Regions:
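Short, well-formed alpha-helical segments that are part of the catalytic scaffolds
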Residues: 13-35
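A conserved acidic beta->alpha catalytic loop
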Residues: 83-91, 139-140
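Cell-envelope/extracellular polymer assembly enzymes that use nucleotide-activated donors
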Residues: 3-5, 78
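Acceptor/aglycone-binding surface of glycosyltransferases and processive sugar-polymer synthases
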Residues: 96, 108-112, 116-126, 131, ...
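Short beta-strand/loop segment that forms part of the nucleotide-sugar
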Residues: 32-38, 71-85, 108-109
Length: 360
């Protein structure tokens, strides 16, 4: 039987974890062999009510009717939560889920907040499924789309990218800047990136192994790696829903740093701006020389002209030097070779599993 791994990045998501687990478990009942002990974030109900709920879950599981309706194979599932150093009650809630659902829920706790990309990387490293689905816990990535992603995988696609057609929680400015980011990225990079692709995607075991072995940069953009790694790809359009509690953890500053690092990581074109600027400067100088010779007049006099030209030239020069500095900063991060993340504790997992499996 094939295995399905669902990797969920969690950072201060206590307000939405209960809703996410309920929604995801309901979907998994339709496509996977899942067994659930009673799990709730409030006080446990009466024993009679608990038995009734367990009996109903077992009945739904045994019938297999949902799996037939979804039109996909039967899978054995694991729900892998990666706690990215949360400071709220998320770690406690995740541990409770893991203890009450040992056959389904796995939890990885980081020693501190390493970032969303690091959390997805940990899920990539520890997941054991034949098909891996990455999503967030705020329900903007709807679990109801999991069966459709599985169907695409069963059709033979190794990469299933989810493309946003609408984002209910994003304003006009964020949507415009997102479109501009992909426009610039596709112009600067020799690779093609699907516009409005999100961190909601699925990959096969083969793609997972390639990403684990060859894509180990410290400054990361996993969804970009997924789109650039090759293999057969397909897309599914979806509308991102409203956040079910909490707020976005991406500030304007974080988005700027993330966008800048991504552009620099996937393109060396900015390094060539110095050549372009030098050609433009030489061309302007040649025009000025021809103008002087034809009119038999001296070069334009006055301090204003000289100051403007010098300011322009130094602006171009420092801009190019700044770009080179950004690339050197990226190289510096790679040379330090510090870990992408540090695991402090795991639940229902072997903490040393990934280190044992690594052969590179």
């Amino acid at each position: 039987m094939k295995k399905l791994s669902i990797i969920v990045s969690v950072y201060n998501e206590e307000a939405s974890l209960e809703k996410y687990f309920e929604a995801c478990f309901s979907v998994l009942q339709g496509v996977c062999l899942v067994k659930r002990d009673y799990s709730d974030f409030s006080e446990l109900p009466l024993e009679s009510e608990k038995s009734e709920l367990l009996s109903e879950n077992k009945k739904n599981h045994a019938s297999g009717q949902k799996r037939e309706e979804q039109g996909v194979e039967e899978y054995q599932a694991e729900l892998l939560f990666v706690d990215d150093g949360s400071s709220d009650r998320s770690p406690l809630l995740l541990d409770r889920l893991a203890s009450e659902n040992p056959d389904l829920v796995r939890v990885i706790h980081f020693s501190k907040n390493f970032g969303h990309e690091a959390a997805m990387t940990a899920g990539l490293d520890y997941a054991k499924g034949d098909f891996l689905i990455f999503m967030d816990a705020d329900l903007q990535h709807s679990p109801k789309l999991i069966p459709e992603m599985l169907r695409k995988y069963e059709e033979g696609f190794h990469v299933v990218s989810m493309v946003r057609t609408k984002n209910s929680s994003a304003g006009l400015l964020k949507n415009l800047t997102s479109s501009a980011f992909y426009f610039v990225l596709n112009r600067l990079s020799p690779l093609h990136f699907e516009a409005n692709a999100s961190d909601f995607f699925g990959i096969s075991k083969e793609v997972q192994e390639v990403l684990k072995k060859y894509y180990r940069e410290k400054v990361r953009y996993l969804r970009g790696y997924v789109q650039s790694v090759g293999f057969s790809k397909t897309t599914i359009e979806y509308e991102a829903g409203e956040r079910q509690g909490g707020r976005s953890h991406y500030s304007i500053r974080k988005l700027w740093i993330f966008s800048k690092n991504t552009l620099l990581s996937f393109s060396n074109l900015p390094l060539k701006l110095g050549i372009f600027a030098s050609v433009c400067s030489a061309f302007l100088g040649l025009i000025l020389l021809i103008y002087t010779l034809l009119t038999r007049k001296g070069a334009p006099s006055g301090y204003a002209t000289i100051v403007v030209l010098l300011c322009f030239m130094f602006a171009v020069l420092f801009f190019v030097v700044g770009i080179i500095g950004e690339y050197i900063a990226l190289l510096f991060e790679e040379i330090k070779d510090r870990p992408i993340y540090i695991v402090s504790e795991v639940k229902n997992l072997d903490k040393n599993f990934y280190s044992k499996e690594r052969k590179f």
